[in-house]
Amino acid sequence: VSRQRVWGVPLPIFVHKTTKEILVDDMVNENIASIYEKEGSDCWFSDDPQRFLGNKYKAEDYDKINDIVEVWFDSGCTHAFVLEKREDLQWPASMYLEGSDQHRGWFHSSLLESCGTRGRAPYESILSHGFVVDGKGLKMSKSVGNVMAPEDILKKYGADILRIWVASSNYEEDLRIDY
């Protein structure tokens, strides 16, 4: 569930230098949570470890771990942070809507996290759509030179043509475009 990166949501873990035991202390965890609520979690990477430990422990006795939460695990938890925290939304979601690349990404990580913590999926259904690809069916890429900016199409043909094309297309398949 972790990665070694310099960006992302940090895992607030201290390991005792001598015993190699992970520090488990509710007061320290509450202090870290309080700081995160006010300032965000990026302070973990820059602030003095003593600030998080408080007066009960000495920073020189602990290694501060700088691993981050694995990004798919992080995104898989969003249902809890969004749907369960907002009164105008309901949990589980009616539908998760994303591209087919998310079968092994967001759909999968959300399903695993939610089933593990709540015993069911965080959504009632999922809807997968295809992607807009070039006229040959290839993924658009700046390095290949086959990218078509929607603004260019709008300038040449107008918004209504683009809307009609999208609305009349089968969302389950990749949409080929060439002009």
Language-model features and meaning:
Residues 1-179:
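Structured secondary-structure scaffolds
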